[in-house]
């Protein structure tokens, strides 16, 4: 999903779940100098986020949404929500960033709170405030709802975004419906906001939904998942979103020799030898040698 090959200075970069390792974020920002970045949740910084990212705060604007693991421990919670850049949380609002209106929905759907496949009236609690009021004082955490449910999506969070007006980009921790563990509610939110792009984390996969055949080019928005330690740069270099962006020409030639007209389909199909990624995504990240060996083996009669 990375676009380093097409554009030296992207406007926006989206980073998949760091889970405490922010070195890839720092390195990419220092190399590519985007105008702004968005962390897609499960940050779990080992120190306050402004300290972990201190070397890049003068180089780019840092924004984030939270993930479900950002409420796992007191340390996870405080290092994010207690940091000096806690006001850069995009959850539940739309902010203009690097020339784009970016909407954010952090956290996950927990069906004990709200199953978005069911009517909102059936939610256990419509808002975190409603949940707090229903709790006994001794059940509260820091006089509010439990720490765990501070990363749960409540109907009120969702509806606030629905009423927020138009946006260009929607960033979420949860995936859209085309993902096997995705949610139609994400698609409905994206379409209501009129976004052109949805970017999510959570599932530790680099996914170009159109290139991998999960969505059609006629879909109302483009969608990408970003893996842990990976990133997506935006805008992409090629206006048509070609599936072959960033792949060395010799790999394209090898694929054509091995598969003929089916070459592109093979390049865009997830493969177990590539940790479930597509050869396209794997090669675009700079890991083209393994794909090259696979194609060579196929040409010589091997089964891959």
Each PLM stretch: what is its role?
Residues 19-25, 44-49, 68-76, 110-114, ...:
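Active-site environment of divalent metal-dependent phosphoester hydrolases
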Residues 100-174:
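Active-site-proximal loop/helix segment associated with metal-binding centers of metalloenzymes
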Residues 2, 6-9, 24-27, 95-98, ...:
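Binuclear metal-dependent phosphoesterase catalytic core
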Residues 14-16, 37-42, 62-69, 89-91, ...:
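Active-site neighborhood of phospho(di)ester-bond hydrolases with catalytic His/Asp-centered motifs
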Residues 242-304:
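Non-transmembrane "mature" sequence context
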């Amino acid at each position: 999903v990375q676009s380093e090959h097409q554009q030296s200075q992207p406007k926006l970069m989206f980073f998949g779940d760091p889970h405490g390792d922010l070195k890839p974020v720092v390195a990419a920002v220092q190399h590519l100098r985007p105008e702004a970045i968005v962390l897609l949740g499960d940050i779990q910084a080992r120190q306050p986020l402004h300290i972990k990212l201190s070397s890049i705060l003068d180089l780019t604007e840092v924004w984030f949404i939270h993930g479900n693991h950002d409420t796992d421990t007191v340390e996870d919670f405080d290092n994010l929500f207690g940091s000096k850049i806690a006001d850069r949380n995009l959850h539940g609002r739309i902010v203009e960033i690097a020339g784009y209106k970016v909407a954010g929905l952090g956290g996950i759907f927990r069906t004990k709170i709200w199953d978005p496949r069911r009517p909102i009236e059936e939610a256990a609690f419509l808002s975190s405030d409603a949940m707090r009021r229903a709790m006994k004082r001794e059940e509260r955490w820091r006089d509010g709802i439990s720490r765990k449910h501070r990363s749960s999506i409540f109907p009120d969070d969702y509806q606030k975004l629905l009423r927020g007006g138009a946006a260009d980009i929607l960033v979420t921790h949860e995936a859209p419906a085309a993902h096997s563990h995705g949610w139609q509610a994400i698609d409905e939110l994206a379409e209501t906001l009129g976004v052109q792009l949805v970017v999510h984390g959570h599932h530790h996969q680099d996914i170009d939904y159109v290139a991998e055949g999960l969505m059609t080019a006629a879909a109302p928005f483009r969608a990408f998942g970003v893996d842990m330690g990976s990133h997506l740069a935006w805008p992409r270099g090629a206006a048509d979103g070609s599936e072959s962006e960033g792949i060395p020409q010799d790999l394209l030639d090898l694929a054509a020799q091995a598969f003929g007209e089916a070459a592109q389909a093979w390049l865009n199909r997830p493969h177990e030898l590539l940790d479930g990624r597509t050869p396209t995504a794997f090669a675009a990240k700079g890991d083209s040698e393994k794909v090259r060996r696979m194609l060579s083996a196929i040409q010589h009669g091997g089964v891959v």
